[in-house]
Every structure is written in C-alpha cells, then in structure tokens.
UniProtKB/Swiss-Prot annotation:
SUPFAM superfamilies: Chelatase. Homotetramer; dimer of dimers. It catalyses: Co-sirohydrochlorin + 2 H(+) = sirohydrochlorin + Co(2+). Its EC number is 4.99.1.3. Pathway: Cofactor biosynthesis; adenosylcobalamin biosynthesis; cob(II)yrinate a,c-diamide from sirohydrochlorin (anaerobic route): step 1/10. This is Sirohydrochlorin cobaltochelatase. It holds the Pfam family CbiX. Substrate binds at residues 43, 68-73. Signal peptide: none annotated. Belongs to the CbiX family. CbiXS subfamily.
Length: 128
C-alpha cells in the first residue's frame, strides 16, 4: 500500500503545524495514507511520521519535501532521518523491505508563481 510522507522544515512558531495538517488533509482526498513530519522544531518528527505510515501498512512510501530547492536538508537530512543509507532506497521494518522514493523539491512552477502573484496583490490591496 502506498504511503505519502510530506516533509516540512518546521519552526519555533507552533502555527507551522497547521500548514502540515492542511496539506495532509488535501492529499488525503487522493491517497489513503498521508502523514507529515518536520525536520526540526515541531512534532511529529519525520521519524514519527514514517513510523505512523508503516504502522498503517504502507510498504511503498513517496516522500514529498515541501522545500523550494535542493540543499542540505534534501540531500543529507531527509535520507538520514528516514534511515536511508547511501544510494539504498529501502529500509527494513518488522522483517519487511519498505521502498522509499524521495520526490524532488518543489522548484519553480508557474502555479506556485501564480500563488505568489495572488499573495502580492492581496497584500497590496489590503494596505492601499
């Protein structure tokens, strides 16, 4: 069964968790098993979110970093926190081999650009 694991950076500001909840709820319309975890500061941690997916029966997991670009968190921290060693994309869980596929960061997308334009316009219109 496919599991989707959203990865958020995290923040000392508790409202960050609301973003994870909203994205997980949205993706739950399309996928049965969706969890989110934070790289730092907030709960659930990435490891806790992974454990939740495994406990629910996920045997293939697509990890979706909600990050704009490739950096240290993407290249080093996410694989380490998931227990992935080197180029190996599998982990062991209760005697089973679990495949983990890490999606690319968001990068540039015109749809995200449209959201940014909307945000600029709304902010400007509220203030002028």
């Amino acid at each position: 069964m496919l599991g989707v694991l959203l990865v958020l950076h995290g923040s000392k500001i508790p409202e960050w968790k609301d973003v994870g909840i909203k994205y997980a709820e949205y993706l739950s319309r399309y996928f049965n098993l969706v969890e989110f975890g934070f790289l730092e500061f907030n709960k659930p941690t990435l490891s806790e979110a992974l454990s939740n997916l495994l406990a629910k029966g996920a045997n293939k997991i697509v990890v979706v970093p909600l990050l704009f670009a490739t950096g240290t968190h993407f290249k080093r921290d996410i694989p380490r926190l998931l227990g992935i060693d080197g180029d190996e994309k599998k982990i062991q869980y209760m005697g089973k081999e679990i495949e983990i596929i890490i999606a690319d960061p968001l990068g540039f997308d015109e749809k995200i650009g449209e959201v940014l334009v909307k945000g600029v316009n709304e902010t400007y219109n509220k203030n002028y």
